[in-house]
Structures are given as structure tokens and as C-alpha cells.
């Protein structure tokens, strides 16, 4: 392992979110027809979606048997944030949502981004956003200072005029920009995501909010305890967030994370084989399931042969 503090590589980012849903067909209608993601895989009660209809996946939906209702006080998902590459791409999706009369819950200018908030069919929070150029991000004494101001929604929607045809699919450059978690304490989130996983703390939002990122991004993970301070841990079979994955750029980072999880007593429950990548699965202090994912092509045959075969589980 390297000397000095461990930092997650700058190229790290959110790979995907995996949600438990009550009705897979209804969720597919929302995420495919209304949002515009494409189905890349389906097997029994699980479907995987992406911006292109190919791997890597951006959103995975599973319909478990006898799923428990979300405990609003428990750790879990605050929202999944779908990031669009241009204002026009975001405006087109918002226009489609308005045409379908899907309810919107909020619209904010965060300085670093323009964002719309809405629920999916199960009430899971969804953010749709586009980043501003980094040169425009607000800072105070050199430190990032995200804000929450009213969004100029009319200005944004002008990017998708009424007389223009709205494409059925999202822009292929769309991805999951960040995950915002509901946690039982931001100190617990800092212990795992900063001290163990090596993400930088970009901003604290008092009371009860903190934002983590790698590579100077405004945030890849948000964590707040506004509704869940000292609440219960995440449930194993509840609706909402089943897991999420952080993409690592190379095998060295993957093996370093494996060593750190062992060192700090975070059990690796399994290695998820997605075909295109391997996800090192563990859980944070709130039992939120997290995977560290690296492309399979980054590993040598010797690397793969040296893995614990009993822990490798094929994604289905």
C-alpha cells in the first residue's frame, strides 16, 4: 500500500445505482419511456438500464418478493442523480415529463449545477441535472461553496422549444453523476467514505450534510441525516436503494480498496461479476451496500486466477 493518506483516484466516479422496486414494469415505464434510458439486460425480476442500451449499466432495477416498505427514518437513498451532458439534453427530458404530467418536486440552481427533483413510481428521489463549467463553480476562499437558489426553469426549457421533436432516448453521454444517501450520522459517513475509501470532503452543509468526491468534482456522494439522525440501519429487502457502485479506473485501486477494507474490518461479502467489470462488495457503517467496480479487462489472467472463487457471484 502507498505511504501517506489514501486518496481514491481522480478518475473514480459513480458507476450505477441498484434499486429495489415494487413493480418492475411500472418502474421500466418511468425510467425508459419518461426519462429515456435504454434497457440493456433483463432476467426474471431484474433489469439493467444505460444511456446507450449497452454496458456499462447505469441503473439496475429489481423486484424482490415481499419487499418491505421504506422506513423514512432509516438509512438508505435520498436520491439518485442522473447527469446530462448538456442543458438541451436535460431540457428535453424535463419537457417530456411535463407533457406526461409527471409531478416535479423542486428545481434548484446549486451554482455548480442546474437540477430538477422528482419521485419515481415508488417515491424514490430522482435528481436530473447538468453541470456548469468548473470555472463557474462558486467558491469562498478557494473552497467549494455549493448553494441552493431558485432555478431559471424558463431559461432552461428554452433549450428545448415546443416545436422541436423530443428524442425518445437520453443523450448517450448521460450517466449517474452522484448518489445522495440518507445516513444515521454524517460522522459515520465520513468514517467510511473519507477515512477508509479515500474520497475528499468537498463541503459540509450544516446541520447534518456532507459531500464527498474524487478528482475535484463537486460531489460523487452526498450524505445527510436530516430525517435519519440516529435512525435504524438500511433494511436488507426494503424498497429503495439495494446498492450502488463506485467505478475505479484500474486494478491497483481495486486491490488497494480490498486491502483497506480488510485492514479496517469491513467484510467483503462478494465479488460481483457483471461480465464487463468486477464489483468488490461491502457495506458502510449504516449497512448501505457499496461496490468498488473496475473493468474486467484491467485484470490479468493471473489476477483473476488469484481471486477467491467462492466469493465471485455472477450478476443476474
Q: Where are each of the predicted segments found?
A:
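N-terminal beta-strand motif that seeds the catalytic metal site of vicinal oxygen chelate
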Residues: 1-25, 79-80, 135-187, 241-246, ...
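Exposed loop/turn and edge beta-strand positions of beta-sandwich/beta-sheet ligand-binding modules
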Residues: 43, 76, 112, 175, ...
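Conserved short beta-strand elements that form part of the metal-binding/catalytic scaffold
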Residues: 38-73, 125-132, 200-238, 273, ...
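Conserved small-residue-rich
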Residues: 31, 168-213, 223
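Vicinal oxygen chelate
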Residues: 11-12, 19-25, 81-124, 183-188, ...
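Conserved acetyl-CoA-binding loop of GNAT-fold acetyltransferases
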Residues: 34-40, 195-202, 262, 266
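An N-terminus-focused feature that recognizes amino-terminal "leader" regions
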Residues: 1-68, 74-82, 95, 223
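Active-site-adjacent scaffolding segments
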Residues: 46-111, 116-127, 136-142
Amino acid at each position: 500500500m502507498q505511504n501517506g493518506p489514501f486518496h481514491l483516484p481522480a478518475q473514480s466516479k459513480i458507476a450505477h445505482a441498484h434499486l429495489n422496486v415494487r413493480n418492475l414494469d411500472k418502474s421500466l415505464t418511468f425510467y425508459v419511456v419518461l426519462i429515456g434510458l435504454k434497457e440493456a439486460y433483463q432476467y426474471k425480476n431484474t433489469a439493467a438500464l444505460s444511456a446507450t442500451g449497452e454496458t456499462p449499466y447505469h441503473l439496475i432495477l429489481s423486484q424482490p418478493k415481499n419487499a418491505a416498505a421504506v422506513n423514512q427514518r432509516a438509512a438508505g437513498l435520498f436520491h439518485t442523480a442522473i447527469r446530462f451532458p448538456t442543458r438541451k439534453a436535460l431540457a428535453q427530458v424535463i419537457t417530456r415529463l411535463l407533457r406526461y404530467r409527471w409531478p416535479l418536486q423542486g428545481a434548484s440552481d446549486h451554482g455548480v449545477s442546474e437540477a430538477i427533483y422528482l419521485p419515481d413510481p415508488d417515491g424514490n428521489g430522482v435528481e436530473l441535472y447538468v453541470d456548469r463549467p468548473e470555472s463557474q463553480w462558486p467558491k469562498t476562499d478557494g473552497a467549494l461553496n455549493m448553494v441552493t437558489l431558485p432555478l431559471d426553469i424558463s431559461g432552461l426549457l428554452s433549450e428545448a422549444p415546443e416545436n422541436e421533436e423530443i428524442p425518445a432516448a437520453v443523450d448517450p453521454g448521460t450517466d449517474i453523476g452522484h448518489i445522495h444517501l440518507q445516513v444515521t450520522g454524517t460522522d459515520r459517513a465520513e468514517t467510511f467514505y473519507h477515512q477508509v475509501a479515500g474520497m475528499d470532503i468537498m463541503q459540509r452543509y450544516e446541520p447534518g450534510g456532507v459531500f464527498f468526491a474524487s478528482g475535484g468534482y463537486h460531489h460523487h456522494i452526498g450524505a445527510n441525516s436530516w430525517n435519519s439522525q440516529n435512525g435504524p440501519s438500511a433494511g436488507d429487502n426494503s424498497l429503495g436503494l439495494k446498492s450502488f457502485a463506485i467505478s475505479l479506473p484500474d486494478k491497483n485501486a481495486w486491490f488497494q480498496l480490498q486491502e483497506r477494507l480488510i485492514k479496517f474490518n469491513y467484510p467483503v461479502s462478494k465479488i460481483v461479476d457483471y461480465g464487463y467489470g468486477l464489483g468488490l462488495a461491502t457495506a458502510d457503517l449504516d449497512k448501505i451496500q457499496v461496490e468498488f467496480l473496475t473493468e474486467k479487462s484491467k485484470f490479468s489472467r493471473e489476477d483473476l486466477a488469484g481471486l477467491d472463487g467462492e466469493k465471485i457471484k455472477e450478476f443476474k
